[in-house]
Amino acid sequence: MWLKPEFGSYVMTAKNMENDTSGQLLADLFDEYSEWYMGLAAEYGSLPRSLSGLSKEGRQFIYLLDDLELHHMMRNKYLRYILDELESVVYAYGGIDLRGDSDAAEVAEVLSVSAADSENYITGDWRVVRDEDGKVADLAHLGTRQGNDPEEHPGTWFMAGSVSFSALEKSRFGALWDEAKPGVIFRDRNGEG
C-alpha cells in the first residue's frame, strides 16, 4: 500500500546539508514528513507508524513500523540501533496516538509527527477524523512546537543521550533489521540511486 511514498519537492542534498544549520534541516524534514502523511491520508485513508533516518551523506531510509511486534521499550531501543547503524544525523517519526480521558469517553486519535536530532526537535499534532468506513477523512492541525530538550518528549528521544547495546541485543536487533530490510524504502537524496 505504501511501497513507494513520494515526498515533497524539497530535496536536501549532502552539499547543502553540510552548509545547512541543524534547525533548518529539522524544519525541512518535519515539513516534508508532515506533507507525506497528509498525502497518505488523502490517497489511502491510512496512517502508518514510521521512522525515517537521514545520514550526513544524504542516505535516507523509511521504515513502516506497524508490523513490528516489540514491547515499546525494546522497540525504542531497536529504533535507536537502526539510526546508529545507518549513521543517521536526523530522523522523522510519525504515528497515531490515543489522547484524552477514557473515563469521560473523550478519547481522540492524534497523528504525531516529529523530526529530531540529538539536541533539537520539532513536533506537530493533527486530530484524525475518520469517515463511516473508518478511513482517514481529514486531519485537523492542533499545533506545532519545537525545543532543545528532545530527551523529555516521546517520539523525539531516539537520538538523545548515549545508549549501549549488549552483545545479545546487537545480535537480536541486527537479525530483526536484516529481516525488515526488504520492506524498507531506501533512497539517496543526492539523486544517485
Where is each model-derived feature located?
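A signal for specific C-terminal beta-sheet/loop modules enriched in small/flexible residues
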Residues: L3, L65-E87, D131-G147
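Short, surface-exposed loop and linker segments with low hydrophobicity and enrichment for Pro/Ser/Thr
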Residues: M38-G45, I96-S114
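Glycine-rich, aromatic-bearing surface loops/beta-hairpins
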Residues: A104, L111-G193
